[in-house]
Amino acid sequence: MNTGHEVTINGVTLAGPAVPRQNELFTAEALGFLAQLHKEFAARIAALGTGSQPRREPAEAAADWQALVGRNLAEPPSTFVYPRRLARTEERILCAGSPMSAGIVDFGLHIHRNAHRLLSEGRAPFMSLLGMESEEELQLWQDLFVRAEELLGLPDGAIRAIHMQPGVPVEDEGEDGQASSAAVLMVRTQPTPVVSAQPMAGVRAAA
């Protein structure tokens, strides 16, 4: 796969630059999972409208691609993930010729690779949905969580989410998951900023 050319696996075309270890992330199973989510949710995501697409220089785009691979292969895996908006597109990952939702890419790669492991360690995969103002988009995320649990054989409510109101600081990140699940997004509207916040919570994986 690390040829620097486009390659298609399970109906998904990778058009990013070749970077070390990307084969470990973009497996046939992971790409098939992304393709399934894309096929089931692309029409609803398109109805949200087109998200703004930042223009990058080639060197910046290559670094961004490397960062995408690196953060998904990081050890130990993150408890909290901050996916991009569903309406944004990932132009370097295509399904049937159409760019995938950047949100689906960020969510799907992390959940496929890490959800079972996180649960086995007594943690839960959290999606931090910062500034998601549309009710339609929030409902889409909830439906994505439920469908991902079904496809991956995860327990109901295994995927958790925090929905932050725009401009509201994170008060704490030591979530126990009691107030949120795949069906209920936790809305945190506390107006008081906190001096120190821990963006990563959970037990460190054993070496």
Language-model-derived ranges and their functions:
Residues N2-A207:
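Non-catalytic helical/linker scaffolds that mediate oligomerization, partner binding
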